[in-house]
Structures are given as C-alpha cells and as structure tokens.
Amino acid sequence: MARAMCGRRSILGLALASAFAFIGLAVAPASLAAAETVRVGIVGGEDEDVWKVVAQQAAKSGLTVKTVVFNDYTQPNEALERGDVDANAFQHKPYLDNQIKTRGYHIVPVGFTAVWPIGLYSHKRHSVADLPKGAIIGVPNDPSNEGRALIVLQSVGLIKLRDGSGILATTADIVANPKDVKIKELDAGVVGRSIDDLDAAVVNTDWALKSGLKPDTDRIAQEPLADNPYRNFIAVKAGHENDAWVKTLVAAYQNDAVKDALAKAYHGTGVPAW
C-alpha cells in the first residue's frame, strides 16, 4: 500500500483498538437479565450464513438475533439511524466516517468482525503485467471504496497518487499513469458484474463473490492485510455502546465458531479482525 498511508492507518488502528478494548472491559454476561431480541442489518449474500452462526452463539446467552437483509451499502445505516434495526454489520471506519460527514448519522463502532481484502480481478488477463496500455479498469464509485481501489492500483504500479491524498483519494489525485489506464467509476454492486466489459476491476470481496468472480483464479492482485484500516465492525446508535446486549452480540461474533463460518462462507477471503 502507499507509504504515505502508513501513519494514518496506524493511528486509526490504534484508536479503534483502544475504543474496542474499553468497551470490552465489561465481560459479556453469561445470560441477559431477560430474553431480548435485536435486529441486525447486514448486506445479503455469504454473510447471511455467517450470521446464522452468530445467532446460534448469541442464543446461548439469551439474546435472540434477527437479521434484516439489505441489498446495498446505503440502506443499513439509514435503517440504523431511523431505529428500524438495532445494529448493523457491513462497513469499515473510512466508510462510516464519510457517511457521518455527509449524512449526519449518530452511529458508532462497537466490535470488529472481519476484513475482506479488496482485489483487482480480471477475466482477460492473468497478471498485472498483462494489462495493456490504455486498459479500462473499473473501480467502486463511493468515496471510501474508490480511494481504497486507487490505492490498490498504486500499490501494483499502475498509477501514482498525489502525496497526502489519503484514503479518500479520487481520480483527480492521480499524478502519474504510465500505462494510461482508463478508470471507469461504477456502483460497488455493478463493477464486478461488468468484468467482461473491462480489462480488470477492483471489487470488494462480497460483491466479487456475488458477481461469480473466483478469488483463487480471477484475482490478480489484492491489498495488503498489514495495518489495514478497512476492518469491518458491528455498529450501533450512539448512546447504546455499553448496553448489555451489545456486549453479548460482540462476544457472539468474536469466537471460533464464527471464524470457521467465515472460512467456509468466504473460502478463506474473509479474515477475522478481532
């Protein structure tokens, strides 16, 4: 990843780790005082299988988890802000920060889940070196994931970003493009399905799998895991961080049964982040 990113990533990682450590000081109770049901917003697909296991783990502590499935990245936060769900689990900190800035949400992270390294995929090329001059490369068009995609392209030498452009870099921050690649901005859910119309595409793992892409054979590059700021987490409305059910929910996710479920559902591409 870009050398300029290391400091900000480390600071972000430490800040989040500290916040979650503080939340974790109170051990999750063996059972809740009364049976309680919580609604958790997730994005449909492989994560539905993972959350079935989370629900089983939560039930052991008296917490009933009902998932509410959405089909894009905007709805889960809208629903959480309105109170239509009690928590959600689908996003990383750069995405939430941008949503708070642009939409004024009152949402906070409470526990890490997993990280899905974003990858560069192609049906036409077998390596980055095979990409021709003028190659058309698709990237997600939402601010946080576009910056993430551009950093991947920089990490493999396809472009260079302006120093200090950070994790919210845009195409306007490209200062060198030796192969004259053409960046095509598409909705995160569309970019993977457009792979046959592109030379390559940077696709989030969940959307890659939904689009029929195979990380083992179609992925020609991926972002590093070290100091990765894109760890996903469970989030709740501000003011509920220390509710007993929140601690129970986080504990229900952060265990070996869910590690196994992640490995099975995502074929090793979903890496536990706690």
Positions of predicted regions on the chain:
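Extracytoplasmic "Venus flytrap"
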Residues: 36-55, 71-75
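Beta->alpha turn/N-cap motifs
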Residues: 45, 69-73, 83, 88-97, ...
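Short helix-initiation/N-cap motifs at beta->coil->alpha
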Residues: 68-78, 165-193
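Pocket-flanking alpha-helical
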Residues: 73-104, 119-121, 126, 146-149, ...
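Ligand-binding "clamshell"
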Residues: 98-110, 124-125, 197, 202, ...
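A conserved helix-loop-strand patch within extracytoplasmic ligand-binding domains
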Residues: 110-160, 259
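Periplasmic-binding protein-like
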Residues: 111-121, 145-154, 209-274
